[in-house]
């Protein structure tokens, strides 16, 4: 589906994407510098609590956490605003996943209960988490590029995961926690003769 985006919406998306990039390339290095300069205060094998206490002394770290949290909120607001205007058309398109001629199929099990620890926390502050919104997959897909400074525009992360599996004559492959299928699809390309299953709590 060709999702329609106005010039104003595209400009806002590009602006928020740029902020995400600045968080990684501008603020991130300042956090690294602080840690490298101050880690001498830690013991040889610091635990997470000790490292957290040290980093909480860093202005860059505290500002970076504030900056990223609010930038995420702006990105979700932007993407949801675009999708909500075309909600019926987008959902109708998503519901065509099992039409004749499609590669593979989707089966949803309404008996599966979402675990409390998963249901009660909005992972990456995504509204509705990954299971509570019909647009969860699209939001992830649109956000991963800016979040990774466009280092995943060709699904490099999914391919790295799939290529990390020792090569073999696999008959069946199960991708646990498949999300939107970033590694599931590469498995299909790498092992075209195998049966590939992707399993996730959330609908795609």
Q: Which sequence ranges carry the predicted segments?
A:
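Class I SAM-dependent methyltransferase Rossmann-like catalytic core
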Residues: 136-155
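Conserved alpha-helix/loop element of class I SAM-dependent methyltransferases that forms part
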Residues: 152-169
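Intrinsically disordered, low-complexity terminal regions of plant proteins
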Residues: 2-46
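Conserved class I S-adenosyl-L-methionine
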Residues: 170-179
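Acidic active-site catalytic centers that drive phospho-/nucleotidyl reactions
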Residues: 144, 175, 200
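N-terminal auxiliary segments of SAM/dcSAM-dependent transferases
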Residues: 44-131
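Class I SAM-dependent methyltransferase SAM/SAH-binding core
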Residues: 184-204
